[in-house]
A protein has these predicted regions:
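An anion-engaging/catalytic patch
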Residues: 1-139
């Protein structure tokens, strides 16, 4: 697993969500199940249940990581997003790649989840590409 980085927050649909990169690949944006539950207005328990019911559909290390399964050296990173009590009480703390998020939303099967999926893909996951593209352009210009 690549190192996880907390790169601040962004406002999405009026909700402040963390910008997390790493885990599946360097500089790859990822999302916690907790954040997904907030965006979709669903209890975290329901999101985790949906993941657990379909866990065979997710590829570990590509789509999903369970941060409670030893992927983190310590829980310090998670304290940016959860309190100690929540971390201790959680059976699973899922982290999903863009691909994993798309798979999960497919299981939700509601029109609202489809709308949110498209919006999140454009405004959260695609933002990484725009930022990286700007950095490359700046680098090329500076090299001239």
């Amino acid at each position: 697993m690549n190192e996880l980085k907390n790169n601040g927050t962004q406002i999405f649909m009026g909700i402040e969500i963390p910008i997390i990169e790493g885990g599946f690949g360097e500089n790859q944006k990822v999302i916690l199940a907790k954040t997904i539950s907030e965006i979709h207005g669903q209890p975290l328990k329901k999101i985790n249940q949906l993941i657990n019911e379909n866990i065979d559909e997710f590829e570990v290390g590509v789509d999903i990581l369970d941060l409670k399964s030893g992927y983190l050296q310590s829980t310090e990173f998670l304290l940016n997003f959860m309190n100690r009590q929540s971390i201790s009480n959680s059976t699973n703390i899922y982290l999903l790649s863009e691909q994993g998020y798309m798979l999960l939303v497919g299981f939700m099967k509601t029109e609202q989840s489809k709308k949110i999926r498209k919006k999140l893909r454009r405004e959260y996951f695609a933002m990484r590409k725009a930022i990286n593209s700007d950095k490359k352009s700046t680098s090329i210009i500076n090299d001239l």
